Amino acid sequence: MASLIAEDLQYSYSKQSQSVLKEVSIQLTPGTLTALVGPNGAGKSTLLRLLQGQHIPNNGQITVDGNPLIISRDQVALMPQRGVLNWSFPITVEGLVSLGRVSHSRSTCCELEAALQRVGISDLARRRLDTLSGGQQQRALLAKTLMRPASIFLLDEPCSSLDPPTREQFLIIIRQLADAGLTLFVSSHDWGQALNAYDKVIVLDKTVLASGSPHEVQKRLDSISCMGNHCCD
């Protein structure tokens, strides 16, 4: 299992544009379920893409078990937001999950079955994507991500469009993955969910405002709010 460290990351989409991220430093450890929380436009999706190697930071460095990300990128897998896929495309669950792999090879079939079992949708393998509920589609997308030979998994807003019962089921699944020793980093705009379901919380708004256990982060944010309102004068 692998850990990831990002130090002093800065990123802008062009030399003329303002920085999307400024001096961002985080650490992700195996067996830990970490939430990345922040408002829309805080840079959450951009940070996940940096950590997966899709973007290159203007400054700072990212290492996986002490090695530069550029030589350890296979250790990091990103599950994009559900909206990036065309769910009306005529493909089955097993077709999506095994997409890009050698079809019908013994290893692919075994990995496919293992991924579907881990997210609890083995019985849906031959169902078309457009017949699934939102929660089932999210599980299929997670299963596809788990097909990557990685131990660090970045999930971009996986619960944003799910109803409360389905959200709870999905959180149970990713908790089990973390308990199995994987490194899970999950972006969310749901502060209540982050406080109740995660081991660690990182609050981002272009830079890291707070990081630690849910209790520690809550105290830190209360302190910031208190200072902003001059309640300690």
Where in the sequence are the language-model features?
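Catalytic Walker B motif of ABC-type/P-loop ATPase nucleotide-binding domains
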Residues: 153-156
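H-loop (His-switch) and adjacent beta-strand-loop-beta switch element
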Residues: 200-213
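Conserved ABC transporter NBD signature motif
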Residues: 60-73
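Conserved ABC ATPase signature
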Residues: 128-132
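Helix-to-loop junction immediately C-terminal to a conserved catalytic motif
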Residues: 52
